[in-house]
Amino acid sequence: MRMLPSYIPSPPRGVWYLGPLPVRAYAVCVITGIIVALLIGDRRLTARGGERGMTYDIALWAVPFGLIGGRLYHLATDWRTYFGDGGAGLAAALRIWDGGLGIWGAVTLGVMGAWIGCRRCGIPLPVLLDAVAPGVVLAQAIGRLGNYFNQELYGRETTMPWGLEIFYRRDPSGFDVPNSLDGVSTGQVAFVVQPTFLYELIWNVLVFVALIYIDRRFIIGHGRLFGFYVAFYCAGRFCVELLRDDPATLIAGIRINSFTSTFVFIGAVVYIILAPKGREAPGALRGSEYVVDEALEREPAELAAAAVASAASAVGPVGPGEPNQPDDVAEAVKAEVAEVTDEVAAESVVQVADRDGESTPAVEETSEADIEREQPGDLAGQAPAAHQVDAEAASAAPEEPAALASEAHDETEPEVPEKAAPIPDPAKPDELAVAGPGDDPAEPDGIRRQDDFSSRRRRWWRLRRRRQ
């Protein structure tokens, strides 16, 4: 006795009603896929060092752009259905819930929307693409179930045991047609076809597993994992298109999606080869606002360390017993370094408090552009801190104060090599006197105190950059 093949039955309907509100299976599948992609993408982005929830902020731009792009691609490649002779018209073209999204347009405009979101959040676009790539292909697999409920995008007729039964559906007007979106199955089989939606669903799940394995096995970054996703999907889509028999735009007898799959596959492979190897540093995933917050939190300690380092490099050894630095001078320099360090830390704490919403005075900020505009010559001339002048004046011979002062302020005199300062005699207290800000008649009292906090910080950061 010959057994009849067991075919895969189609769902009896693709839409249900909650009162007057229609619930379409296609829309439910698309929304479910988007949610799954966002959950997976946000978890992966957080694991790479990104801020939790940032994926959802970017999705506010990417998802609408993707839906619009998918619909536009569908209309462009299947325009006869809507705008040809006997077409459904513009109103049907706008009913996106009836189905009809082109993945190529969805990915293209979705990436553009993601780029806008990444710019606003301050993270590189390739980082996000690598994080969401597995979730996107899994979302496509879930979305293919919507084609199953709509009885669309099927292949040629077949006698294979896994063939898909397409039923006649009775639409609200009473006609029995096989492609009615709002109709209910009559139980009568119209034809048996290749379940191309199922082939692509299985392929997308395999691509999802492959991407997860590649990402864990190798160090993939800079958008290369997204390139693998595009290449793998295009290879599978090209094969599936060869089995489809539904109406589509043809070029030289070949479906337009086959051409698209080929060209996009080549572009993805080229990008994988040319893209930088390795993976981005976790700090690049924090976003601009998070990087600023982290920098402000570290600023007090960093600026204090920079102040001490710059003072030490400018003044030289200040320990007791140094031939060029009497103990009183060393103690004076140490005291001034400590005072300035405390001042830097206090001002930085004020900045952190401002960020947290406390009422504090505004502090002048210094941009990187101001620092980079400084010429190397300016850096060399401004590198010594203000207290270096005190140290040099204190280490000079006391018997020649007028000569030193005139050399320091006379711009017409040529520079002469510095002479080693004589060792002061402890028996002569006058030689141990520390020059004060008002000891030099050519230097008004307090002129060294006129630099504000911003100029000191610029000087310290310049010194630090030079040492690095």
UniProtKB/Swiss-Prot annotation:
GO molecular-function term, one example from the UniProt record: phosphatidylglycerol-prolipoprotein diacylglyceryl transferase activity
Biased amino acid composition, Low complexity: 391-406
Record field: compositional bias (Basic and acidic residues): 445-455
Membrane topology: Multi-pass membrane protein
InterPro entries recorded: Lgt
Cellular location(s): Cell membrane
Keyword Acyltransferase: no
Record key words, sorted: Cell membrane, Membrane, Transferase, Transmembrane, Transmembrane helix
Sequence ranges of Basic residues compositional bias: 456-468
Binding annotation for a 1,2-diacyl-sn-glycero-3-phospho-(1'-sn-glycerol): R144
Name of this protein: Phosphatidylglycerol--prolipoprotein diacylglyceryl transferase
Pathway: Protein modification; lipoprotein biosynthesis (diacylglyceryl transfer)
Region described as Disordered: 349-468
One GO cellular component term noted in the UniProt record for this chain: plasma membrane
Annotated transmembrane regions: 21-41, 56-76, 96-116, 192-212, 218-238, 256-276
Pfam family membership, one: LGT
Keyword Disulfide bond: no
Classification of source organism: Bacteria, Bacillati, Actinomycetota, Actinomycetes, Mycobacteriales
GO terms under biological process: lipoprotein biosynthetic process
